[in-house]
Amino acid sequence: MTFKEKLQHKYALSEQGAKDMIHAFISATISNIVLMFPVGMLYLLVKNYMEGTLKEKGILFAAGCLICLILIGVTTYIQYNATFLSTYVESGVRRITLAEKLRKIPLSFFGKKDLADLTNTMLGDVATTEQMFSHYVPQFYASIISTCLIAVSLFFY
């Protein structure tokens, strides 16, 4: 069973939803790693300040700060599109699938239930999964991956 199939099974995603979720993991991981660049710049700034070579490299640090800001902006934009927009596309698919399943249930079932309560419960659950897939799941996996990558890279520095 591939990772994509595991995601489809675990989170009840469509095939495209699983692909989008993997893309969200990757983009959030890259965004987290790019957020570490200013820390590296600060380390180099303090190191050069302590060595007394900061004046010669001022333009280099200004350019580095500008590049960091641009990279953070670009990766955050990509992460936003990968996590939030794709989540709501998948949510539409999930709502349609739910409606198709409800269509197949006999009408006598709905006569025994309070329709307002049933609708509120189901749509509340869908809204909760939307929030989970847009806010928590990609960032959780990305934080694990990026933390491991950053920890390993610190051993080599």
Identify what each model region corresponds to.
Residues 21-75:
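Transmembrane helix-loop-helix hairpins at lipid-water interfaces of multipass membrane proteins
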Residues 31-36, 69-73, 85-89, 105, ...:
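Residue-level hotspots within the lipid-embedded alpha helices of multi-pass solute transporters
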Residues 39-46, 80, 95-96, 112, ...:
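Alpha-helical transmembrane segments of polytopic integral membrane proteins
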Residues 46-54, 87, 91, 106, ...:
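Membrane-interfacial segments
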